[in-house]
Amino acid sequence: MAISMRGRAVEEANRQHAARIVFHTEIRYSPDMKTRFARFSSLLFLLGSLTGLAAANPPFTGGRWIDLTHEFSSETLYWPTAERFTLETEFHGQTPKGYFYAANRYRASEHGGTHIDAPIHFAEGHKTVDQLPIDQLTGAAVVVDVSARAQKDADYQITVADLKAWEERHLQIPNGAIVLFRTGFARHWPDAKKYLGTDEKGTDAVAKLHFPGLHPDAARWLVSERTIKAVGLDTASIDYGQSTLFESHRILFEKNIPAFENVAALDQLPATGAYIIALPMKIKGGSGGPLRIVAWVAEKP
């Protein structure tokens, strides 16, 4: 009984559908009606597109940007053997044709101020700064705060225990994270003696450098136990000031993991939840370069 009724219902539906097809095929549109229909269809498409744009959520709303970059000037700190930043005026003023014009030239070593170390810096045959993909320079960040220890010991080296303790308080460092280390030394910028341990210049000054860095064992743990995009910290080098072998650089760079150095304002970032955009000057074949690094931090609900 139920099967018979269902069959009749299907037949009736098919009959009505066929009738609608016949009705529509018999309609004849005048040229004027076709024009109006085309215009109406275009209007519907435009309205639909605008509605879609309005409904789409624009990126980076409901939060704030934090600039993690020290400005470049005559006060910018560099390695004792590196050429410092200089800005020279090429022209500044009114031109003979009556309009204002300004242009400068600058000189500096790649590695100074807020900058990036590309893997080629300590790993032969590895990526130069222009070869680093944008995806590797952007992403979610975790901030490991060792400022309490670094305040007591200028030669402090961040350990595997520090990383594991951070994970116990928060979560496992996610795959694809950018790992930032806050030592608190950014508060000394641009006082060279406090930030670097010496304000002297030249080869002899290198032995007098004192600032915190990442212990080679911690660098090795990061590349073997976690999958990260990049590292960064608020001192002049990933390795601590007294390093002579730069092992942490070598361990990270052998895996094509770049480093951000002399990062500012890490005290303004949460332990988790910040999104980093770190874009260096795209120097072909460069071992590093000036870096503009910013963080997006969403507002707490």
Regions found by a protein language model. Give the residues of each.
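Active-/binding-site microenvironments in catalytic and ligand-binding cores
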Residues: 55-301
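Bacterial N-terminal signal peptides
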Residues: 41-52
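Short, low-complexity, intrinsically disordered N-terminal modules
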Residues: 6-7, 11, 21
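Bacterial N-terminal signal peptides that target proteins for export
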Residues: 30-43
